[in-house]
Amino acid sequence: RAISHPADDRDPGVDRHFFGWLAYVAFVVYGSLVPLDFQPLPLDQAWATFKQIPMLQLGIERRADWVSNGVLYVPVGFLTVALFAERRTLLTRLPVVVGATLFCFALAVAVEFAQLYFPPRTVSLNDVVAECVGSVLGIVLAVYWSEWFREMLATLTGKLGQLGSRVLQAYAIGYVAFSFFPFDFLLSTAELAAKVDSDAWGWFLSAQSTDRSAFIVAAKLFAEALAVVPLGIILARWNVVRRLPATRHAVLYGALLGLLIEVGQFVVFSAVSQGASLLTRAIGMYGGARLWADRKQLAELHAHAHNKVLTVSLGSLYLLALTAVNGWFDHRWHGMAFAARTLAETRLLPFYYHYYTSEQVALLSLASVALMYSPVGVLAWLRRWSPALAFWSAALTASAVETSKLFIADLHPDPSNVLIGASTAWAVSKLLRRL
């Protein structure tokens, strides 16, 4: 007879939650210290400097960085409460809420203090305040939404049904938040006037959107439409519940969504507003609704996807588009000597290049790379490959693309893209196998 030990009955999800929380906290610390240029400093001197860190007067150009620091800590507060305060009443969760608040504040102070040893990081009271505000906001959100979040995690681990609904809900929340990131809203009439006089908006296309080739502009518009497809699926499911055609009002609601977002983005300093986005969102909304209406045919497509002709054709078109958006056809190519110089200047540290740009550009870069390699996960799903094979296929593809940038003028390889692309392909393949 087997002897049962208390440890045998422990929920394995607890360990997964802890390591997931720990991974995000580690990411916050790592991202706050990149480029990891450690410079020794006596502790007493560091402490004396830290006690005198200033409260800076931030203009609108630096407001996005300040807000982004706070946004980075929202998940810290949220996850600390949502994953570890499993009791439902506020009173019984109060000790965890207090502990989470103290932990987040201590983390913010410790990270800012550590940045003294890692120039050129900037240390200021502004950052500490932003990180504490973000932590509190995350904790407040967890008080009201932690139950939904735990149910979402349960669906991903196979403990509950309705995985598709939960994923779509999470995507909708993320889509709206992403649309207004980094939340540097205009706060005065002078700032609004500056936005009106800028090239960050246009009745159809903004001047900022047309500074690259026509193919890149078309690819960006296509990505905008593609990003709304899951919202079209949500609309179609809602229509079906009400016994209406799946595509009912899809174009109208897509255009209205585009209008609301573009008007909202007009009062975000870092955002770009353009009329073409109404059209792309209308197309994306209708496309998502149509996909849901034709889901049986798509299931048949998956059933017959072992046909190599289909997947090879799709894969060839994908590789053509991938190489095009990565500058193969509109940039000059050079030889081995140029590649050797570029390689010598390349930094292999993950997310090194994200530090030397704004938070909005860094997030857009991450999202665009994820979108570029998500088709690898779809193709792997069609071919019934394992998620691990999807991961390595995307890693190999991204490595080839990044290596090619050694030979292309005005571009530089970023090893982070290999990690981002491979992880995205794995996640897409894993999710499609579960739906």
Regions found by a protein language model. Give the residues of each.
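Bulky hydrophobic segments
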Residues: 1-435
